């Protein structure tokens, strides 16, 4: 296969639940159409923001099927499909492809802390098991260890369908090495909303965003201004959204963003344990900022 260049504004979709803890299928459909209207480029269900660790394999498959059905050909669906056991990750990836995913986001193995060679072999095994693009998800803050730039670049060169990395570290030296040394058809996207502007100023391709759950058109516009080289317009958008970017992580993601969506009337405020509701003082901070942004009254 030829790599598809992945770029633009991707949203790490939340997974809405009902009060009985079941997946809220109708809310998922509403969210997809919200993003179609806003011009989001890529939908990513079943990732970290989608509470994937608490979803069963059957639930993940159904969510991907719903998102793909509703999205149609209007945007790319890149499903989260990763874990720290390689063969289980392969199974999740294969099931996601069968469910209609057009690309995969696969988190770096966590807890067992593999060597760089272990990371390489893990991703190579996944890439060989599917025929769609694979996005390496490097998030040291959650996994406890870092996939080095050299390992990511080796995968990009050796594996035809290792198409991108979601770089969710704040290691600017690593980011610059990836951007300077990557193949032309390999995408580097940030996983940090607060870094969209500097990241793309260095040549990054876009963002896999949490904030886009709330303000998809604005995040898309920020990415577009950076692609078009209008730093001044991008700076205005960044400064307007920067407090929201921070508040989305005032407690563990996705709790803050799901609370915000509940205030906006888009989902119920339900989390699966071990995630729990925000502290009252943090709810007030988020409410205040949503009012400032005109998202709630």
UniProtKB/Swiss-Prot annotation:
Pathways per UniProt: Amino-acid biosynthesis; L-lysine biosynthesis via DAP pathway; (S)-tetrahydrodipicolinate from L-aspartate: step 3/4
GO BP of this protein: diaminopimelate biosynthetic process; lysine biosynthetic process via diaminopimelate
Cellular-component GO terms for this entry: cytosol
Location of the protein in the cell: Cytoplasm
Ligand binding (pyruvate): 49, 208
Active site annotation, chain numbering: 137 (proton donor/acceptor), 166 (schiff-base intermediate with substrate)
Keywords: Amino-acid biosynthesis, Cytoplasm, Diaminopimelate biosynthesis, Lyase, Lysine biosynthesis, Schiff base
EC id: 4.3.3.7
Domain of life: Bacteria
Database matches in Pfam families: DHDPS (PF00701)
InterPro entries assigned to the protein according to its UniProt record, in alphabetical order: Aldolase_TIM (IPR013785), DapA (IPR005263), DapA-like (IPR002220), Schiff_base-form_aldolases_AS (IPR020625)
Chain's role: Catalyzes the condensation of (S)-aspartate-beta-semialdehyde [(S)-ASA] and pyruvate to 4-hydroxy-tetrahydrodipicolinate (HTPA).
Annotated protein name in UniProt: 4-hydroxy-tetrahydrodipicolinate synthase
Organism: Chlorobium phaeobacteroides (strain BS1)
Lineage: Bacteria, Pseudomonadati, Chlorobiota, Chlorobiia, Chlorobiales
């Amino acid at each position: 296969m030829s790599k598809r260049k992945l770029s633009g504004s991707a949203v790490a979709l939340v997974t809405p639940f009902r009060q009985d803890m079941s997946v809220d299928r109708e809310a998922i459909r509403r969210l997809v159409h919200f993003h179609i209207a806003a011009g989001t480029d890529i939908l990513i269900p079943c990732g970290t923001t989608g509470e994937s660790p608490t979803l069963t394999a059957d639930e993940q498959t159904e969510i991907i099927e719903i998102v793909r059905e509703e999205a149609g050909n209007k945007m790319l669906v890149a499903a989260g499909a990763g874990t720290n056991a390689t063969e289980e990750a392969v199974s999740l990836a294969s099931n996601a492809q069968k469910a209609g995913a057009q690309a995969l986001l696969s988190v770096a193995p966590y807890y067992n802390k593999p060597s760089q060679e272990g990371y390489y072999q893990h991703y190579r095994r996944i890439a060989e098991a599917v025929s769609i693009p694979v996005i390496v998800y490097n998030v040291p803050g959650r996994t406890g260890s870092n996939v080095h730039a050299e390992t990511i670049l080796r995968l990009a060169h050796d594996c035809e369908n290792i198409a991108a990395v979601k770089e969710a570290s704040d290691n600017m030296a690593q980011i610059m090495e990836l951007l300077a040394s990557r193949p032309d058809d390999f995408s580097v996207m940030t996983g940090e909303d607060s870094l969209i502007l500097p990241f793309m100023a260095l040549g990054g391709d876009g963002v896999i965003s949490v904030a886009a759950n709330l303000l998809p058109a604005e995040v898309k516009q920020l990415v577009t201004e950076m692609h078009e080289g209008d730093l001044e317009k991008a700076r205005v958008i960044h400064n307007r959204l920067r407090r929201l970017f921070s508040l989305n992580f005032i407690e563990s993601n996705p709790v803050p963003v799901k609370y915000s969506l509940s205030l906006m009337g888009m989902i119920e405020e339900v989390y699966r344990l071990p995630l729990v509701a925000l502290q009252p003082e943090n709810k007030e901070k988020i409410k205040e900022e949503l009012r400032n942004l005109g998202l709630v009254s």
